[in-house]
Amino acid sequence: MNAKSQSGEVIIEGEYATLKYERRLAHPREVVWKAITDPSELAMWFNNKAAINGRNGGTIDFVTGPAGFQTTGRIIVWGPPRVFEHEWHTAPHPQLPNGEAEAVIRWELVRDGDSTTILTMTFSRLTKPTALGFAPGMHAFLDRLEAYLRGDPLPDWVLRYDAVKSFYPS
């Protein structure tokens, strides 16, 4: 698939927006689950340091790069290996002066045969300016996830961001 066919959707509702991506991954659901919930695996493709208290009501604490956003939140749904939903509260940062107080990320994994997973990632309750900036960034992170799962060299995040930003509104 080409990058355009992998692009996500930006849904704007007033001052808020939702980003939605769907990827078909040639890996079992359990492998994908580990890649999105295990801090050592997240560090490989999501450019972050993560602490995840994996349970309903648990917490997440991420420092996500390359900007180094500090993000915390409560786990809303912990349903291995199907659903991981958590708040995404980002502290103010030079690139995000007001932070993000209400955002939520939902990862849904649906088995498609024995060794394929459909990943749907929904990033909701983002302020509109943040969503417009994050849309190509999340695309780039998901491209890195796919490369990581395949065992391929990971694409440079900044180069991927630049390559896909024309697919999204600005």
Over which residues does each language-model region extend?
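A detector for short, charged/polar N-terminal pre-domain segments
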Residues: 4-12
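Short beta-edge strand/loop motif at the mouth of beta-sheet-based domains
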Residues: 20-21, 27, 31, 40-74, ...
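Beta-strand/loop substructures that line and gate deep hydrophobic ligand-binding cavities in soluble
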Residues: 16-19, 92-147
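Residue-level recognition of conserved beta-strand positions in structured domain cores
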Residues: 64, 87-88, 121-123
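Conserved catalytic core of Hanks-type protein kinase domains
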Residues: 35-36, 78
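A conserved amphipathic terminal alpha-helix motif
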Residues: 1-4, 125-170
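A short, structured loop/turn motif at beta-sheet edges
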Residues: 29, 76-82, 108-118
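Short, solvent-exposed secondary-structure boundary/capping segments
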Residues: 82-90
